[in-house]
A protein has these predicted regions:
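Conserved PLP-enzyme active-site core in the AAT-like
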Residues: 1-279, 283-307, 312-327, 335-344
Length: 345
């Protein structure tokens, strides 16, 4: 029996339609701008995000770094949440590669940042300080329960950013999870953003790739930044073909992942010794804790892996599970049975 892999939605396999599209993709040299399949994907991504242009890049980390490099010069400062993926999991690339200073401010439990706190973090025009140039938001917010940030909040933050002369970048790795959860077009969530990135290779199930979207002028500069990072690809239409299928066929089904995540959270919360918060689960990310401290997260994760269920141990007593294609409701019930068995319930 195949293991149930809940470590991340990055483990999604490409669909048969994706494999067929990749095998049949029309290609050219994308560095010369001659790959027609890449162009179609970029046009589609721009349309779905309501932006004028888009750019295919290799990964979400590259997408975020490209956007930071375009918005900020060396010695400039970006403001971002203290729980953001960029701050925790992208190797400090903004500083290491771009010379960009990160200034963290607290994320609230729902992934938002108080606009008052944002405004207070903006530097005065003084030679002692870096220049505040960029505000980064994350939607959905990975470390904050996969919470979606709604359009009302995004628009309110945009007003603050405008007053403070900050550009806005949205790390939208799971932007379409947010759109599905909130029942609105993805474009509505990033209408006021200067740039947005999203992943094709998470819940949308493409094997590789992320998109950077913004104005035509922004994407022209992003293309230069991609090149210096080694991200210029040649016959990239083979990758882009899967991305087209992802955007046209895999968005609506994200709702299934959200249902499975809620069921998983409810089941975990009902197991003696564990705690989860089903009410906090709005998309496909579930955090749960060993409430009675009978074992550690690492030990439980190892026991589950031996029984065919893979999850991530994050902290001494805290774990994460992420639902995704092609997992089913039956897989969730099997997972819960394995957890009960491993805990002796």
């Amino acid at each position: 029996m195949n293991p149930i892999d809940l470590r991340s939605d990055t483990v999604t396999p490409p669909t048969e339609r994706m494999r067929k599209a990749m095998a049949e993709a029309e290609v050219g040299d994308d560095v010369y701008g001659e790959d027609p399949t890449v162009r179609r994907l970029e046009d589609l991504a721009a349309d779905r995000t309501g932006k004028a242009a888009a750019l295919l890049v290799a990964s979400g980390t590259m997408a975020n770094l490209v956007c930071q490099l375009v918005h900020c010069g060396r010695g400039d400062e970006m403001i971002l949440g203290d729980q953001s993926h960029i701050f925790h999991y992208e190797q400090g690339g903004s500083a290491a590669v771009g010379g960009i200073h990160p200034r963290t401010v607290p994320n609230r439990p729902d992934g938002t940042i108080d606009p008052v706190v944002i405004e207070a973090a903006v530097r005065a025009d003084d030679v002692h300080f870096p220049r505040s140039r960029l505000l980064v938001l994350e939607n959905t917010h990975n470390r904050c329960n996969g919470s979606p940030l709604g359009a009302t909040y995004m628009n309110r933050v945009a007003e603050t950013a405008g007053r403070c002369r900050l550009k806005i970048h949205v790390d939208g790795a799971r932007l379409f999870n947010a759109a599905v959860a909130l029942g609105c077009p993805a474009a509505d969530l990033v209408a006021r953003a200067d740039s947005v990135s999203f992943c094709l290779s998470k819940g949308l199930s493409a094997p590789v790739g992320s998109m950077v979207c913004g104005s035509r002028e922004f994407v022209t500069e992003a293309r230069r930044a991609r090149k210096v990072l080694g991200g210029g690809m040649r016959q990239a239409g083979i990758i882009a073909a899967a991305g087209i299928v992802a955007l046209t066929e895999m968005v609506d089904r994200l709702a299934e992942d959200h249902v499975n995540a809620r069921r998983l959270a409810e089941g975990l919360d009902g197991i003696e010794g564990l705690s989860a918060d089903p009410a906090a689960v709005h998309t496909n990310i579930v955090f749960f804790e060993i409430a009675d401290r009978r074992t550690t997260a690492a030990a439980l994760a190892a026991a589950l892996a031996a029984a065919g269920v893979l999850v991530l141990a994050l902290d001494p007593y805290r774990l994460r599970a992420v639902t995704h294609y092609p997992l089913t409701g039956a897989d969730i019930e099997r997972t819960l049975a394995v957890v009960r068995s491993c805990l002796g319930n």
